[in-house]
Amino acid sequence: GTFVLVDLVYYLWHRASHRVNLLWAAHIVHHQSEDYNLAVALRQAFFTPLTTLPFYIPIALLGVSPLVFLTTVALNTVYQFWIHTRLVGRLGPVEWVMNTPSHHRVHHGINPEYIDRNHAGVFIVWDRLFGTFTPEGQEPVYGTVQGHHGANAIAANLQPVADLFRLAARRGGLDAVKTLIGPPEWRPASEGGPQPVPVPNPGLRWDPHPPTPIVVYSGVWMLLASLALTIVLFAQADLPLAHQGALAFLLLWTVGAWGGLLDERPW
């Protein structure tokens, strides 16, 4: 029962994260990739724990124990890993009930007919019940409508949120509020009103070509940092909180530096 309830709440959060600008700015990093593979499943937003919290609190109020809740959320997340692939086709009757790679490819597509569809985590029945289901038809074009060109993971998480607040401040008044809580396509009348979703051009992809030495250097650095992160995770129980914070900051700085190198920025 808890598994089904958690999946329903996940659906509600996920749907809201595509229809409320502030939540979308926090979630958008998961959709920025113009490829669709298992690595996309690992492209998780910094702010997800904050945005999911208000949705999951009612489950605690129902008396579900923390252990059961955390285990259920973990299983829900693990299930969603394998559906981020183009290698698995249609799965017949399974697709009537379960979320599958085909259903989730639709969710990541920016084709106009695929925008804001198939928000399910595990059970696609939520989309069927609430009118947000669309079967896979034409080949999806992946990414975001506005596009994202950059390898800096820190900027990918923070820039959309900063841009949204700057836009709200520029519009001011009630339009500022609507900018934050309205859907992504919303525009004030002075800017032409709600904008239709453009038809994407699959030939327009971000295709960077950083110098080979930079790629090799960043790859080696990534392996070393990953090893360091693994050691920290296993040893964190024995580390003072200040040391954990310092190591976390160093790892984040490292991630930002990779992005700067691969984007060939002067700093």
PLM regions: where:
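Hydrophobic alpha-helical transmembrane segments
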Residues: 12-21, 161-167, 194-195, 218-224, ...
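Membrane-embedded catalytic scaffold of the fatty acid hydroxylase/desaturase
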Residues: 1-150
